[in-house]
Amino acid sequence: EFSIIPDPVYDPSNEINIVKTTANSYQVKEGDYIQVITPTGRQCSDFVAYDTSKLDKGKENGLDWQTTRTFMGHTFPGPGLFSKFYDVDHEPLVEVVRDTVGIHDTFNLACTSKYYEDAGYFGHINCSDNLNEVMEKYGVQKKKGWHAINLFFNTSAGGQNSVLSDESYARPGDYVIFRALKDLTCGTTACPSDIDSCNGWNPTDIFVRTYDKKKEFTKSFAFRMKTDSEKKLTRNTGFYERTSKLTRNFIDARGFWLPNDYTKHGVINEYTACREKAVVIDLSSLRKFEIIGPDAEELMNY
């Protein structure tokens, strides 16, 4: 079976191979990074995280879908401005730093025994029972169904108020990287579902790496020029060092981070500047040439 585990970005602090149909739990410190990889592609994974300091006080506050979707205005946060997952206390727990798939699920529970029983598969192993088993040692109460981030699930809103699910778009070696915004207690599954298309009808392993915060990951989506092309991560342009000081609102434009607007200016002022003053626009996504060198200013003023 074809499988890819991409090389570490730098030395990981921990590596966990989550065998198919099982789960594992682990803890990370604030600022650390969590990389969840689908080595064979099309294998889905449920991710849960709790604020460790609150758990130590007997309070369970995990990632919450509704709070996240409300604050982010997106069905699933992604790298950039709208990147955070929140708990019910409105505190951010993780930030999405890199995402090479971009399609995940924040509507459904991690799979449950009831899901399989309703389909006629009594006693089928499921993610919720697996999470109950591995999270219990950290004092997290058992649940019939877990509110998880369902990574790599191809879920969307359909017509007539339906929620649709199909085979994952993830390819071998695809991954998501989170940055912990608190000390976190986490759980990750390798989904065991073999009765529908979510895992390509064939459950496989999930691989997790954690990295300490000594280095910083660049924020990136994956961009493919064609369906069979190798993925390329979003890049900063030659102007990013300056524009990043003027705004946090960047969008992915054909593989480059471009400013969407500038803080404290607004659409009207920007429009007026285009008509009445001079503006510099970053057109790197159009593959324009960058002008560099000691005489660059003279050339631009020519």
Regions found by a protein language model. Give the residues of each.
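Acidic, Ser/Thr/Pro
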Residues: 1-219
